[in-house]
Regions:
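A surface-exposed partner-binding patch
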Residues: 1-110, 155-156
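Compositionally biased, low-structure terminal segments
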Residues: 46, 68, 126-127, 141-144
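Short, surface-exposed linear patches
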Residues: 67, 89-90, 121-125, 132-134, ...
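Ampiphathic alpha-helical segments that act as solvent-exposed interaction surfaces
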Residues: 99, 132-155
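Segments surrounding the PLD/"HKD" phosphodiesterase catalytic module and close analogs
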Residues: 109-137
Length: 156
């Protein structure tokens, strides 16, 4: 089984730049903001997700938003991982040990399962409105690679 890295993600971003709209390291959240978000959520972000935030901030793959960390909810609620997850938990759409990172227009929800957090990582699952959660990726890099390939029409 392949272990995905940030280099794998970077190669796919270069290859499929026409369907990807990510930020850059220059506009990425700093360590203080990331720590504040983690404290507010009561979860430590995975190493792969933190690396993504520091290198790409967040953005979209096709029309699918990848949630990020924003400064003090500056009127940007749609893609803010803290705001979205606190509301999801409050409204019964997620459990405290699930960190939702993306929702598609088709009702798919992708989230980290923190009940399996080990060595700085935990797997991602997805679920549709009508079904049970299904394993999706071993880390955030694999998640990104699979989502990019799916949007590009390449088999994951």
């Amino acid at each position: 089984m392949k272990t995905y890295t940030l280099d794998d993600v970077a190669q796919l971003i270069d290859k499929y730049s026409d369907i990807i709209n990510f930020g850059t390291a220059e506009d990425a959240p700093d360590d203080i903001l990331i720590e504040k978000a983690e404290k507010t959520l009561g979860l430590q972000f995975t190493d792969s997700y933190k690396s993504f935030l520091k290198n790409y901030k967040g953005g979209e793959i096709g029309s699918e938003e990848i949630f990020s960390v924003y400064v003090e909810y500056k009127g940007i609620h749609a893609g803010d991982i803290v705001y979205r997850n606190l509301n999801d938990i409050k409204n019964g759409l997620a459990k405290p040990q699930q960190l939702v990172v993306s929702r598609t227009d088709f009702g798919e929800t992708f989230y980290f399962d923190y009940t399996q957090f080990r060595d700085g990582e935990c797997p991602l699952y997805f679920e549709v409105i009508s079904g049970d959660p299904l394993y999706y990726a071993s880390n955030f890099y694999e998640f990104l690679c699979k989502r990019i390939k799916e949007h590009a029409g390449e088999s994951a």
